[in-house]
Structures are given as structure tokens and as C-alpha cells.
């Protein structure tokens, strides 16, 4: 269990490591390409309210991992607690560290203001400042400007990244806990990995986060799920004859 969760955590961590390795820094949208719109659509699967739909779809996709409906319902409860706990951790860390997002830093630089002044405003005023500034930026499309207006909170850590990492950890954790090594289970984990990696890339590419925001989000999700699945395994809550432990 621990090894498998750690392996997929490491795979996600490759994204911020590669960003650092290639010294990529977001500084405006002058390098934005057409395919970035597809990254935006993907990143929206982790945005409120669409994230709720994503959760419902994923919970249904996980159904085949469980032996019966009762076991699946218990699993859905664990999924809900997992998503809720990681989002609470994310919110707490954002409040404590209060780090500005890349696109707000860029706004402050170009308007000769400060991020402190920006975040001193309430969210509605921040959205107006974002709209006013990015409306003058020809390289920022309307869909991205609207996304910025909706995401004027703090940067560290990434909520979308912890959301994506959480669902990957759930897929890996439940497949291990229930001993489901079927092709469908491996396909689910593979799809969740690709979705998660693209989610992480989108957050940096669209000017929403720094690599450290992604890294801490991933590690936080890993730590939470090591605790969750260790507890479930120890208490034998999901009893099954196919359980594996590695």
C-alpha cells in the first residue's frame, strides 16, 4: 500500500520537478497557444461547481472496484471525507501563508502596485481589478480572464492539484486495499494519472500556481491517504479475500 501510493505520488511530483529543471517561469500569456484552451477545460473539472460533478462521476467510475453496493457506499463515504479533509488542509495552508498567485504578481508589477494592496480588497473588488487589467492584455483570451476573476484567492498550495492528487490516491489506495488488479483497475489508475498530470501542468501553464504550490499539494494528499488507507487496512473495514499488501 505505502509503496504504491508513494510511487504514484512520485509520478505527480515529476511535474513540478520538470518545471524547475527546465527553469520555466510564467510571466504573462504571450506564449499561450490554442491547445491551452483544452488545458483550461480540464482545469475546470477541478473548479467549483464543476468539481462536484467530477466527484460524482469518479465515485460512479470507482463502483467496479467494490464487491457489492454496501461496500461501494462505504467507499463513497471515504471518498467524500478524503476530498473534504484535503480541501480543509488546503484552505488552512492558504490562510496561513497567504502567497499571491503568479497572475496577481504580474498584475501588480504592470500596474506599479503591490500584491498586498490587491489582496487587501475583498474578492469582488479583486475580480474588478483583474477584469480591468487583463481586458487591456491582448494575449489574454476572454475565457482565461474570466477564470482569473473567479480565482483571486491565494496560491499556496494548489487546491486543484490536491484535488487531482486526492482522486489518484483514492484510485490507487482502493485498488490495493480491495486487491483489485484487473485490467479495468489499471486502466482507471492510468487515466487518473494522466488527468492528474495534465491538471498540474495546467495550473502552471495558465499562471495560477508556482511549482512549489503543486509539490506541497501532492505531498499533503499523499500524507492524508497514507493515514486513511493504513487505518482502513488495520481495521479491516473493507474485508475481502483478495486484499494485497505491498
Where are these regions (language model features)?
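Membrane-embedded catalytic cores of phosphoryl/pyrophosphoryl-handling enzymes
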Residues: 2-6, 126-246
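Histidine-/acidic- and/or cysteine-rich, low-complexity loops and terminal segments associated
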Residues: 22-24, 104-147
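Helix-boundary and loop/linker segments of multi-pass membrane transporters
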Residues: 26-33, 67-69, 141-142, 181-182
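Alpha-helical transmembrane segments in multi-pass membrane proteins
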Residues: 77-86, 90, 217, 221, ...
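N-terminal transmembrane-helix/juxtamembrane module of multi-pass inner/ER membrane proteins
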Residues: 1-65, 74, 90-112
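Interfacial loop-to-transmembrane-helix boundary motif in multi-pass membrane proteins
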Residues: 68-79
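Aromatic-anchored segments of alpha-helical transmembrane domains
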Residues: 13-21, 83-88, 194-204
